[in-house]
A protein has these predicted regions:
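Sec-dependent N-terminal signal peptides
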Residues: 4-14
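Sec/Tat signal peptide C-region and signal peptidase I cleavage site
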Residues: 15-19
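Small-residue-enriched, tightly packed secondary-structure blocks
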Residues: 20-227
């Protein structure tokens, strides 16, 4: 039993252990671009064009892990970009932790896209840390070529979520999860004196390795229109 708990603890901590290297941030950007492309390419399951038009920021967590032998906890590291007057900003790096998905056996990876759709949600993302469900509300976003004629999705939550497990779309309750700046990764890419707010406000030039992710963000609307 002790050995099983040790394995569980190592698995839960694994995603946090390799943050901060340039190789990790490059891989994360490439994986995030792939997640965006694949979610948008899913017939009648992609993010609607209207939602993308309305988006203030888009955040992607490739392969968020839930695991543990008692209570499942979320662990993931992602990238985010916000809309500025000059286009989409350079990517900021963040971590998502906490919350619970109930009793779990083993570990499962989930791809997550969060569309921040109003000024309040954007301001929370610009801060160094906030809690979903407390500082900002989240709800499952509409899917398909066009958003529902019902406009509740524009008003009900600051964040619309889209999640995928093993290629299938799945609902995900992020209540209680905390999103914070990934300091190690930010320093690895931008140096020690650049924070998340400066990056997402468009004050920092995007590094070359961000090109695939930013291209996926810019191209998402075209993919939605072509569904």
């Amino acid at each position: 039993m002790k050995k099983m708990m040790t394995v569980a603890a190592l698995l839960a901590l694994a995603p946090l252990g390799w943050a901060g290297s340039s190789a990790d941030t490059t891989d994360r950007l490439e994986d995030a671009a792939k997640v965006m492309h694949e979610i948008m390419a899913a017939p009648d399951k992609g993010i609607p064009e209207e939602v993308l038009d309305h988006a203030k920021c888009i955040a992607v967590v490739p392969h968020m892990v839930k695991g543990g032998f008692v209570v499942g906890a979320e662990h993931g590291r992602g990238v985010a970009s916000c809309r500025t007057e000059h286009g989409w900003s350079a990517p900021a790096f963040f971590a998502i932790t906490g919350g619970s998905w109930g009793l779990q056996i083993g570990v499962e990876g989930v791809d997550l896209v969060m569309v921040i759709q109003n000024e309040k949600g954007m301001q929370q993302l610009l801060s160094s840390k906030f809690q979903i469900g407390g500082d900002a509300s989240a709800a499952a976003g509409p899917v398909g070529r066009h958003a529902s004629a019902n406009t509740d999705w524009k008003m009900d939550a600051e964040i619309l979520t889209y999640s995928r497990a093993k290629g299938a779309f799945a609902g995900l309750d992020l209540s209680g999860s905390a999103i914070r700046q990934d300091d190690d990764s930010m320093k690895a890419v931008y140096g020690p004196d650049v924070n998340q707010k400066a990056v997402l406000n468009g004050e920092v030039k995007a590094p070359p390795e961000a090109a695939p992710f930013l291209s996926a963000i810019r191209g998402a609307k075209e993919q939605a229109a072509g569904q």
